[in-house]
């Protein structure tokens, strides 16, 4: 990073932890669905409604979150978002009725998506110039994973200390998350700088955001290239959530063992592979995050080909685990780098937030359709056919990533060569 390196690393860690754990109460169902039904009195259908309420609101708010990131103080927005999310969590800990929970979920979407999502990514990206984006975003993704994993393990330990029928157990977990959010919000106030100061540190022209910039962002080809790269990688991320089902149904692995593999892939790999992608861009000959994603996508495509070949006659569970882990590595390393692509493409800082918001809307669309499609295959087809279709979907997604990283890198190379040509004249 640049001047005052230690403070910037601390700032990056605080932003990353905040951005990572802030979603945990909104997605409480992922770990605590049974306790939610038992202690909060919701049916599984109602819990599904609670989740979909947040998801729909999030999709709507991704694009406006970019405008927020470009118009308002990063320090004030991140601090406010974390503290308000913590206060909402304290309300959630009272075990409110369904209509209140739905309102809380909408409020969570406002604080974590509208106020925090694009702001946190832009604030992190401004901690370095375009050549440092791979390192910054890689470590951001890894630190997010560390924060999520650490807090999840701690709250699970606290939850396990209570009797199975003690309703205080879930309440305590929610309160712990809420207090952590508020404390992180306070830390953000002292460590996160306002975007005006960061622009000055990077010697960039201070420009105010205008409504016409939204259309300008949509007219920039690299916005669409970055969006489609994220779209493809996120499709693989969604597919990996079925790894537990795949190992149990196709290889006969026990549910407990497969669940541990799910933790390794979804928690540990997220913490390790994001920084690893940044390290590759920093210390290898391939300095470009876009090129690294392309190489990882080729490796992922070969892995999916192997999974497709072994799908019809699975025999070695070790091979199945190895291939899933390899696919997980390519996915999480790419996730740690894809937000570096707009910065590498020299997106101006004054529209970086809007770019992130638009890329989020397009790139995260697989979150809407992948799960229903794969679920339909699982319900209507034999397991082997369902997972064959899933691997084919993944291959199509990575093929798209390879194409759009090629197009994006061509644009980046052209932009990099322009200053050199100008200086030689």
Curated annotation (Swiss-Prot):
Localized where?
A: Cell inner membrane
Broad class of the protein's primary localization: membrane
Q: Which GO terms describe its cellular component?
A: plasma membrane
- UniProt entry keywords in alphabetical sequence: Cell inner membrane, Cell membrane, Membrane, Transmembrane, Transmembrane helix
Q: Does the keyword Membrane apply?
A: yes
Mind listing the GO molecular function terms for this protein?
A: transmembrane transporter activity
Q: Which PROSITE patterns match?
A: MFS
Note the Pfam families from the entry.
Answer: MFS_1
Stretches assigned to the Periplasmic side: 30-48, 160-171, 241-259, 313, 376-388
Record's bilayer topology term: Multi-pass membrane protein
Q: Which residues lie on this side of the membrane: Cytoplasmic?
A: 1-8, 70-75, 118-138, 193-219, 281-291, 335-354, 410-425
Family the UniProt entry places it in: To E.coli YihN.
Q: Which PANTHER family match?
A: MAJOR FACILITATOR SUPERFAMILY TRANSPORTER 16, ISOFORM B (PTHR43184), SUGAR PHOSPHATE EXCHANGER 3 (PTHR43184:SF12)
Q: What is this protein called?
A: Inner membrane protein YqcE
Q: Which gene encodes it?
A: yqcE
């Amino acid at each position: 990073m640049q001047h005052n390196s230690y403070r910037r690393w601390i700032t990056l860690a605080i932003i990353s932890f905040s951005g990572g754990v802030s979603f945990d109460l909104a997605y409480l169902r992922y770990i605590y669905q049974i306790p939610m039904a038992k202690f909060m009195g919701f049916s599984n259908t109602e819990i599904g409604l609670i989740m979909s309420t947040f998801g729909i609101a999030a999709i709507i708010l991704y694009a406006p979150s970019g405008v927020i990131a470009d118009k308002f103080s990063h320090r004030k927005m991140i601090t406010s978002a974390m503290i308000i999310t913590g206060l909402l969590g304290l309300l959630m800990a009272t075990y409110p009725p369904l209509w209140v929970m739905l309102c809380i979920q909408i409020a969570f979407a406002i604080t974590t998506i509208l106020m925090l999502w694009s702001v946190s990514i832009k604030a992190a990206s401004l901690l370095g110039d375009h050549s440092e984006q791979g390192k910054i975003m890689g470590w951001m993704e890894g630190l997010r994973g560390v924060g999520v994993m650490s807090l999840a393990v701690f709250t699970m330990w606290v939850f396990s200390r209570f009797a199975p029928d003690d309703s205080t157990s879930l309440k305590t977990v929610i309160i712990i998350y809420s207090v952590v959010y508020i404390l992180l919000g306070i830390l953000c106030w002292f460590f996160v700088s306002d975007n005006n100061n960061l622009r000055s540190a990077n010697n960039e022209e201070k420009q105010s955001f205008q409504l016409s910039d939204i259309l300008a962002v949509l007219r920039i080809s690299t916005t669409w290239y970055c969006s489609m790269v994220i779209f493809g990688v996120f499709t693989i991320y969604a597919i990996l959530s079925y790894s537990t089902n795949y190992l149990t149904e196709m290889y006969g692995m026990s549910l407990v063992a497969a669940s541990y593999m799910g933790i390794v892939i979804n928690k540990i790999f997220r913490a390790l592979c994001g920084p690893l992608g940044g390290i590759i861009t920093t210390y290898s000959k391939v300095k470009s995050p876009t090129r690294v994603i392309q190489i990882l996508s080729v490796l992922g495509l070969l892995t999916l080909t192997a999974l497709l070949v072994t799908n019809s006659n699975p025999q070695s569970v070790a091979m199945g685990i190895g291939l899933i882990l390899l696919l997980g590595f390519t996915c999480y390393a790419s996730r740690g780098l894809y937000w570096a692509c707009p910065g590498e493409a020299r997106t101006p800082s004054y529209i970086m937030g809007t770019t992130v918001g638009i890329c989020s809307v397009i790139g995260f669309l697989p979150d809407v359709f992948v799960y229903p499609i794969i679920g339909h295959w699982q319900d209507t087809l034999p397991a082997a056919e369902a997972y064959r279709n899933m691997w084919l979907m993944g291959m199509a997604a990575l093929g798209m990533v390879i194409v759009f990283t090629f197009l994006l890198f061509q644009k980046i190379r052209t932009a990099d060569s322009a200053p050199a040509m100008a200086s030689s004249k």
